[in-house]
């Protein structure tokens, strides 16, 4: 769901922040 849609978006932002 919906959680499956929100969580990847958060992970992308988090990963972008951490791996920059």
Curated annotation (Swiss-Prot):
Post-translational modification: Phosphorylated.
GO function term, MF aspect, one: DNA binding
UniProt superkingdom: Eukaryota
UniProt KW rRNA-binding keyword: no
UniProt induction comment: By progesterone.
Expression (tissue specificity): Uterus and embryo.
Annotated keywords: Cytoplasm, DNA-binding, Nucleus, Phosphoprotein
Coarse class of the protein's main subcellular location: cytoplasm
Gene Ontology CC: one annotated term: nucleus
Location of the protein in the cell: Cytoplasm; Nucleus
Family under the similarity heading: Belongs to the EF-1-beta/EF-1-delta family.
Reported function: Binds DNA.
Official protein name in the record: Implantin
Species classification: Eukaryota, Metazoa, Chordata, Craniata, Vertebrata
